[in-house]
Amino acid sequence: MSFKRDGDDSSQLNVLKKRRVADLLASYIPEDEALLLKNGSYACTVCHHRPVFNTIDMLSVHRTGKKHLGGLQRYYGKKLEHKNEIQKRRHFDFVRAEDAGEKPPPGPAPLLVQTKRITQNALLKSAPYNSCCSNKKVVANSRNVYDPHSGPSTTTGLNVPLDTQPGPSQPHTSLHSPPTGPCSSPTDEIPPNKNNSRHKKKGEEKFRKEIADPERERNMEHYLQLKSSGWIPDGTGKWVKDENVEFDSDEEEPPALPPS
């Protein structure tokens, strides 16, 4: 889609081209220069005061400022010094191993490692997410549920030694240990939950019926075909033409559902 502009000023055209390129490259920010926070904001990792921005457009405007450009030079200067220091230490270890007559372990070629990383990223369906914010949450439950197949239960909040064996005169008793006797067994005390299994079976049967229903599948295909052809529902159960779509024919009614 192209937009008309007033006048034939070449400078104005260049300004529009530059703005368009800047908009397209706004999201092209290296992963180590920005940080995605838990609340959806963006933090600049280049500047020492870590400014936070609500949108990526505001972050792009900040990246064009003088303070950020100055901090960018210092940031990459420190990274270059760190890289040179690592290379010097590796060279020192290599020379020391040669003087001692030892054979240094062969390491992967840097160019080969870089090529392999680029190839792996190119084969991915989406860009690899790299951020310090982790969505994994570990939920600790202090209550213990007895499982007959897992043996004796263990407590989360109490430090109970497991290697101490109770003597014959002092039987070991616990609130979480199941009662033992000739008339009771763990499997009898904890019957399987039949309601959950019934609901699960009903849900699976309903899902299979929806998948195997040809009428529903035909209706879905017809709906998708109308949407792709430029027809939109008006909310009353009827289909109307989209004003932003050009139609080849002058038909006022959408194509009907084909017979089965």
Curated annotation (Swiss-Prot):
- Which segments carry the region annotation Disordered? 143-260
- Please tell me which stretches of this chain the record labels as motif Bipartite nuclear localization signal: 4-20
Q: Does the keyword Secreted apply?
A: no
Residue stretches of biased makeup (Acidic residues):
245-254
**Biological-process GO terms, alphabetical:** alternative mRNA splicing, via spliceosome; RNA splicing
Zinc finger, Matrin-type: residue spans? 42-74
Q: Which InterPro entries match?
A: SCNM1 (IPR033570), SCNM1_acidic (IPR031625), Znf-SCNM1 (IPR031622)
- Identify the Pfam families for this entry: SCNM1_acidic, zf-SCNM1
Q: Which UniProt keywords apply?
A: Metal-binding, mRNA processing, mRNA splicing, Nucleus, Spliceosome, Zinc, Zinc-finger
On the tree of life, the source organism's domain of life is Eukaryota
Annotated GO CC locations: nuclear speck; nucleus; spliceosomal complex
Give the Basic and acidic residues compositional bias ranges: 202-221
Q: Which GO terms describe its molecular function?
A: zinc ion binding
Regions of biased composition (Polar residues) lie at 166-187
Compartment annotation? Nucleus, Nucleoplasm; Nucleus speckle
Q: What does this protein do?
A: As a component of the minor spliceosome, involved in the splicing of U12-type introns in pre-mRNAs.
PANTHER family in alphabetical order:
SODIUM CHANNEL MODIFIER 1
Q: How does it assemble?
A: Component of the minor spliceosome, which splices U12-type introns.
| Name of the protein in question | Sodium channel modifier 1
Traced from the root, the source organism's taxonomic lineage reads: Eukaryota, Metazoa, Chordata, Craniata, Vertebrata
